[in-house]
Amino acid sequence: MNYRLIATDIDGTLLDDEGNLPANTYQAAAYLEEKGIRLVLCTGRPLLGVLKIYDDLKLTSPVVTNNGAMVYLSKNGPLIHNETMSIDDALHVIALNDIFNCTICMWHNNILYVSQLNKYAYDYAGITGVTPLLLDQIDLRKCDNGPTKFVFTDTLEKITSIRETAAKLSPSSVTAVTTRPYFLEFFSSSISKATALSKISEALGIKREQIISVGDGFNDIDMLDYAGFAVAAGNSHDEVKKHADMIACSNNEGVIAYIVENLIKK
């Protein structure tokens, strides 16, 4: 198959457990660039949390951020897809935290708002590279559009214990899914990485069967199902692996290099 695009999740897939790029990923990315195969970052992160990785790998490809809510044809744009939650749904999600008492992180117009400035907020902000503002500084009722997404963060034990209940209590138009074991994300159910890839396919004239998707998390499943060929990182949850055509090495060993050696060069 003449593959033209590899769509990869970042955390738990592209990056190792320490949040770094495995050494063999740089050479693999350079090989893909030389062959004209787009390496597309598809992540729950906002654009600002992607730029260093994008630049380190010397990419020129489109970028999918916020679980598919925003799609850029390159790091400098243009923005070809942008979808947000409704304000009513957003207010409902905020109210859920009266039950769960987690730290809320909310993205609105590429600004990060947090319910309190504590360890959890600063840890999340550190990953994204954005300085957070307090949530009480914005009144969603007076905004023209809703937020892109929410992240509830706390201990692994708490997030694990509330995940299913939070999903049941969320509006039907909102998806609640863990993107890291200690991050529970809420976003519009019409948002998906698969939808984002379809926008890129249309813009670049790339067919689904020419796309490889790779991920490790539950929020990657729709992307794996969309692509012509699906790869799960070796560290993926067993349920995610059921959606894969190939099980690669773990994220610590360089998943993209594994795909290049075992699929692209074959």
Predicted regions and their residues:
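Conserved acidic, metal-coordinating active-site core of Asp-based
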Residues: 96, 100-214, 218-222, 235
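Short active-site oxyanion
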Residues: 36-40, 60-61, 148-149, 209-210, ...
